[in-house]
A protein has these predicted regions:
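TRAFAC-class small GTPase G-domain
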Residues: 1-192, 196-199
Length: 199
């Protein structure tokens, strides 16, 4: 019986957690390209997302004992159009972390971050899970419409970490995603969470 119990524990240990994170932001800010850059996929033929869809990736995170463990992450891509609001709200309810994306060349996408935070509040307590802001398209510095200072002031207001990213060059992408994933993993350890799946 002891041997059987040991085998069962080993099987459980080999199973992986599946965490869920969600991209939010206006249409054409680069949410889909950021996710594909994170997956190391080709950026050709990118189209606007017209429904919530996800990619499944694997990454290593640090456990409390300092050792690495591999987990799976569902990275949900949400549409930025108003008509898909219900889909977005449903996705928020089933996520453990959110990355808010704006385009540094489009001031409106930055101003609308406040709107996206309010949408989160309609579905879930925003203090119950971590956020990361991605200031995207830094490869287009000559067209920059939102300064680093403006973006940092907004992030500081909510105490959200902010990363400057480019899906084209890959700058900041891995760091931003890895920060959010590690934070989500840390915040869910020891919790009973119905949104965490064991595979």
């Amino acid at each position: 019986m002891g041997e059987c119990s040991s085998k069962q524990k080993n099987r459980v240990a080999k199973k992986q957690q599946i965490l869920s994170i969600l991209a939010m932001g206006n249409s054409i800010v680069g949410k889909t390209t950021l996710i594909q850059a994170f997956e190391k996929k080709s950026l050709e033929d990118i189209k606007s997302t017209v429904c919530t869809q996800f990619s499944l990736v694997k990454r290593k995170v640090k456990q409390s004992n300092g050792e690495d463990v591999e987990i799976k992450i569902k990275v949900w891509d949400s549409p930025g159009q108003e008509r898909f609001e219900t889909l977005v709200l449903n996705a928020v309810k089933n996520t453990q972390g959110i990355f808010l994306v704006f385009d540094i060349t489009e001031k409106e996408s930055f101003d609308d971050l406040q709107k996206w935070i309010k949408k989160v509040e309609e579905a879930k307590d925003p203090k119950s899970f971590p956020f990361v802001i991605m200031a995207n398209k830094i490869d287009l510095q000559s067209k920059r419409a939102v300064s680093k200072e403006q973006a940092k002031a907004f992030a500081d207001k909510y105490n959200f970490p902010i990363f400057e990213t480019s899906a084209i060059t890959g700058a900041g992408v891995e760091e931003a995603f890895q920060h959010l994933i590690q934070t989500v993993y840390d915040s869910n350890q020891g919790k009973s969470n119905n949104n965490i799946i064991i595979d």
